[in-house]
A protein has these predicted regions:
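N-terminal intrinsically disordered/low-complexity leader segments
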Residues: 1-13
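C-terminal peripheral helix-coil segments that are non-catalytic and often amphipathic
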Residues: 1-3, 99, 103, 131-143, ...
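Amphipathic alpha-helical linker/stalk segments
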Residues: 2-5, 62-92
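Helix-turn-helix
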Residues: 13-17, 21, 25-59, 63
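Conserved hydrophobic residue
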Residues: 31-32, 120, 146
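Hydrophobic alpha-helical connector segments
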Residues: 77-107, 152-159
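All-alpha amphipathic helical-bundle segments outside canonical DNA-binding/catalytic cores
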Residues: 88, 123-128, 142-158
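A contiguous binding-surface segment within folded domains or other stable secondary-structure elements
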Residues: 106-138
Length: 202
C-alpha cells in the first residue's frame, strides 16, 4: 500500500503548532528545562516530527526566537533603504522597538530566559541581525546628527538595553510613589528619548 504523503499545508500547520508549543514552554520554563517530549506532547506531534522540521532542540530554539524579531527587523531595513538617515527615523526606530516589546509580553519572557541562561545566540544580540542598525548609527555620526566620540554599536546597545530592561522589570516599579499617577510606559519612553537624543546628539 502506497504511503500518503503529508501535504505542504499540513506540514506547515504542524511546524507552526510545534513552534507555538515550544515558544510557550521556553518562555515559561527556559530552554534547559524544556524537553522535546514536553514540546511533542503540547503540540500533539512526535519527537521525530520536531527533529524533521528543526533538526534539534537547539535548532527549534533558534527559530522560535528568530520569528519574534523577523518582521520588526525587515520592516526597519526596508525603511533604511529609502534614503539618508534622519533623527526622526532613529527616533521612530526607538519607538518601534519599544512598541514591539510593549505589545509582545511573550517576547519579553523569551528575552529574559535567554539572558538568564546566557544565550549568546539570542536574535536580539545577533551581530549580523543588528548590523544594519549599527550602520545606521554610523551614518548618523558621519552626517553630524549624532556625536562621533562613542562607538555606533554602543549607541544602539545603550538604547535597546534600557528599553529591554524596562519591560523585563517594570512590574517591580509599578508601586513606586515617585511614579504614581503616571502612564508608566509612555512616561518612561519620553524620558529615554530625552536622555538618549540629548546625550547622543552632536
Amino acid at each position: 500500500m502506497t504511503a500518503i504523503k503529508r501535504r505542504p499545508r499540513d506540514a506547515e500547520a504542524t511546524r507552526t503548532q510545534i513552534l507555538d508549543a515550544a515558544e510557550s514552554l521556553f518562555a515559561a520554563q527556559g530552554f534547559g528545562s524544556t524537553s522535546l517530549a514536553q514540546i511533542a506532547q503540547k503540540s500533539h506531534s512526535h519527537k521525530s516530527l520536531i527533529l524533521h522540521h528543526f533538526s534539534s532542540k537547539d535548532g527549534l530554539w533558534q527559530v522560535v526566537k528568530e520569528r519574534r524579531f523577523s518582521h520588526f527587523v525587515e520592516e526597519r531595513k526596508s525603511l533604511f533603504s529609502r534614503g539618508g538617515v534622519t533623527l526622526d527615523e532613529i527616533r521612530n526606530s526607538v519607538r518601534a522597538y519599544f512598541e514591539l516589546l510593549k505589545n509582545d509580553p511573550l517576547l519579553v519572557q523569551l528575552l529574559t530566559r535567554a539572558e538568564l541562561e546566557q544565550d549568546l545566540s539570542c536574535s536580539q544580540y545577533d551581530e549580523k541581525r543588528l548590523a544594519p542598525f549599527v550602520e545606521r548609527m554610523r551614518e548618523a555620526q558621519k552626517t553630524g546628527l549624532l556625536r562621533s566620540d562613542v562607538p555606533p554599536a554602543h549607541l544602539l546597545l545603550i538604547v535597546t538595553n534600557v528599553i529591554t530592561q524596562w519591560f523585563e522589570a517594570r512590574a517591580m516599579f509599578a508601586g513606586w510613589s515617585e511614579l504614581e499617577g503616571e502612564n508608566l510606559d509612555s512616561s518612561f519612553l519620553e524620558s529615554v528619548e530625552k536622555v538618549f537624543f540629548e546625550g547622543a546628539k552632536k
